[in-house]
């Protein structure tokens, strides 16, 4: 990250601003910690916490919100929790870009850095000391928004994302997991220490549009998969056309299984299956199946969507940030993403991922109105209606229709009762 006098002054202000919070709210560490018991007891619910950040570049305010979130949602425990000696795996959305625009205009491409740092501070208060950051993509850009500097400040170990073919044979710094009910991948490699004993995973996604409609908490954990297995989006060329060393880990009847699902969805008349978009309906279908394969073998302790400011566009250099002052979280990332998708102006029933997840037994509904919603107020959950929250249109280029603007909402009415019947 480019260090300027302005940036140094803002960091000093942020540190000063959090000092009184640390003294007023800090908790004595105990041998274990846990997610708030109400969240644990309601795994099918989604929780929304309003934040108070006046401007997306207000570092002090964002740091305070991250720390306040951690203090609200993670609690010290004497027993029946997660030992503080565990390794905590942090998975923010690290996407960062630089193009012809000022850096501030690209700030919404990934999880906010100061919110991320505030969460780390809150976890350290609980006595946690062993942190790992893992990411497959865009190593060159990890510090564009100062995220690598944050990891260095707090002793967070960062992985080396690139691997050679022999590393897959040797299992070098990766953990392999067999998929119980596969469609595409029968085995998936993740960067160590994912799925190793004595680890706990925290998923901190961004609220933003993407070619898969929106990239939220379910897609965020895709970045834990070792390259090139992580390439879920290119369709058949990373399935039947994947490198030879990957082929033993791809289902022997993948074409039959994917095509059978696809043709059934066309027959049922789901929206946008006639789109001629480059990220085609089949690309979306394969991405959803790979995502469901991965979801069977990844189990975060908590999933978060940071929406202090959201972003429309393509997920990278095209798009605008919108100050939305909202953080969403929950145990079930499909349900969490349904709410994030709906509040982003889209209708979840029109998106392949949720329908396929239900067909494959990972969801019991993809109707956002059937998800219990709570607002987190002063450290406590308060039951709300989904309509109590403002929708912010996050336009995407997902499966553009003929005559439709390139960036649009996927908001066609969907008859959930017909599908349920």
Feature annotation, model-predicted:
Residues 2-421:
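N-terminal and secondary-structure boundary signal
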């Amino acid at each position: 990250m480019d260090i300027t006098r302005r940036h140094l002054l803002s960091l000093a202000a942020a540190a000063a601003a959090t000092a009184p919070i640390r003294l007023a709210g800090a908790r004595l560490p105990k041998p274990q910690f846990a997610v708030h018991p109400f969240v644990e007891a309601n795994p099918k619910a989604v929780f929304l916490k309003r934040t108070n950040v006046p401007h997306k570049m207000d570092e002090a305010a964002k740091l305070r919100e991250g720390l306040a979130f951690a203090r609200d949602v993670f609690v010290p425990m004497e027993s029946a929790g997660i030992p503080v000696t565990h390794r905590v795996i942090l998975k923010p959305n690290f996407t960062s870009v630089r193009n012809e625009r000022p850096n501030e205009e690209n700030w919404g491409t990934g999880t906010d850095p100061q919110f991320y740092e505030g969460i780390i501070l809150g976890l350290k208060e609980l006595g946690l000391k062993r942190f790992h950051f893992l990411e497959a993509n865009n190593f060159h850009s990890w510090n564009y928004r100062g995220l690598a500097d944050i990891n260095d400040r707090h002793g967070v170990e960062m992985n080396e994302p690139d691997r050679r073919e022999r590393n897959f044979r040797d299992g070098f710094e990766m953990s392999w997991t067999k998929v119980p009910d596969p469609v595409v991948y029968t085995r998936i490699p993740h960067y160590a220490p994912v799925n190793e004993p004595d680890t706990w995973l925290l998923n901190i996604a961004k609220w933003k549009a993407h070619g898969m409609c929106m990239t939220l908490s379910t897609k965020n954990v895709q970045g834990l998969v070792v390259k090139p297995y992580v390439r879920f989006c290119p369709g058949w060329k990373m399935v039947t056309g994947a490198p030879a060393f990957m082929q033993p880990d791809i289902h022997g009847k993948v074409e039959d299984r994917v095509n059978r699902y696809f043709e059934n969805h066309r027959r049922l008349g789901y929206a946008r299956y006639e789109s001629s978009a480059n990220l085609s309906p089949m690309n979306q279908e394969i991405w959803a199946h790979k995502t469901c394969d991965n979801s069977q073998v990844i189990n975060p302790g908590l999933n978060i969507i940071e929406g202090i400011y959201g972003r429309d566009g393509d997920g990278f250099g095209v798009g605008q940030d919108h100050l939305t002052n909202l953080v969403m979280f929950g145990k079930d990332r499909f349900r969490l993403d349904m709410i994030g998708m709906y509040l982003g102006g889209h209708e979840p029933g029109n998106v392949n991922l949720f329908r396929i997840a239900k067909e494959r037994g990972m969801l019991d509904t993809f109707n956002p109105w059937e998800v219990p919603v709570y607002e987190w107020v002063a450290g406590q959950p308060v039951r709300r209606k989904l309509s109590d929250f403002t929708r912010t249109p996050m336009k995407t280029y997902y499966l553009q229709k003929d005559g439709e603007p390139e960036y649009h909402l996927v908001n066609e009415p969907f008859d959930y009762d017909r599908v349920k019947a």
